[in-house]
A protein has these predicted regions:
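A beta-strand edge to alpha-helix "cap/lid" segment located at domain peripheries
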Residues: 81, 197-198, 203-206, 216-217, ...
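Glycine- and acidic-residue-biased ligand/ion/polar-headgroup-sensing regions
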Residues: 60-78, 182-200
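Bacterial N-terminal signal peptides
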Residues: 6-15
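His-enriched metal-coordination microenvironments in redox/metal-binding proteins
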Residues: 55-60, 66, 101, 105, ...
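Positively charged n-region of N-terminal signal peptides that target proteins for export
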Residues: 1-4
Length: 247
């Protein structure tokens, strides 16, 4: 009798509202691997195998993302219709963050990128020579803005009140370059093979695509290209980071 009453009560009771899924912090999402963190950035190397997907995860701050290889993914933002995102190898994107989503890779190849969380408020966004942020007018991209010299081109991508991002492409015969940064700068290798680095106070390294480095303001960094293949990199300079010496 009691069992019959319980079944009847369950049938007659109003249905409970469905619980919304809870997003995990980005650092807890298993496809996101933290590779660098300081007062300005948290940098994640992201890899999603073919026909796999991330967990629902939260983006709480603005961030940059740059594709390593071509990308074709479904961006499922919580509470919004799904959208397809197609990116070329080395294409840079920017997001204001403050949402949760799932990145679903329905293609037959892995999806790889570098996600760069920006830990300071960014303020106004300006495209310079590339439309990184759709709908934002590009600034004048003149020869004086674009740095071109023998074997190398350096093209400003976009900037905010806090950062400036540029993309450099180097010819195979660009065997060695030395860079002096005037602000703390994030370096991301986008293309190349066996690029070697020499930075004062740090052990020499051999970089592979997707590797990142933090270059201190005022430091000299020398890069060698022993394979004599074309290579490319992204730099993100952080305004106000001149005194950042502890990383």
């Amino acid at each position: 009798m009691k069992r019959s009453f319980l079944v009847l009560a369950l049938l007659l009771s109003p249905s409970l509202p469905a619980q919304a899924p809870v997003a995990v912090p980005i650092a807890k999402e298993p496809h996101h691997h933290l590779v660098l963190e300081n007062d300005y950035v948290r940098v994640f190397r992201v890899s999603v195998p073919a026909h796999d997907a991330t967990l629902l995860h939260q983006h709480d701050v603005p961030y940059l993302y740059i594709s390593l290889g071509p990308a074709d993914v479904i961006n499922a933002v919580q509470g919004k219709p799904e959208a397809r995102i197609v990116m070329a190898d080395g294409q840079l994107g920017y997001s204001l963050g403050h949402f949760a989503h799932i990145a679903r890779n329905e293609s037959d190849v892995p999806f790889n990128n570098v996600t760069i969380e920006l830990l300071k408020p960014q303020g106004e966004v300006q495209n310079i020579c590339v439309e990184v942020v759709p709908g934002v007018e590009k600034q004048t991209c003149s020869r004086s803005v674009m740095e071109k010299r023998s074997g190398m081109s350096n093209v400003p991508q976009f900037q905010t009140d806090e950062i400036s991002a540029s993309m450099a492409r180097l010819d195979p015969d660009a065997e060695q370059i030395t860079m002096t940064q005037y602000t703390g700068t994030l370096f991301v290798l986008l293309g190349g093979s066996g690029i070697q680095t020499m930075v004062k106070g740090k052990p020499d390294q051999t970089l592979v695509v997707g590797d990142v480095m933090w270059l201190l303001a005022g430091s000299n960094a020398t890069f060698y290209n022993p394979a004599h293949k074309a290579w490319s990199y992204l730099t993100v300079g952080f305004k106000g980071s001149e005194a950042l010496h502890k990383y």
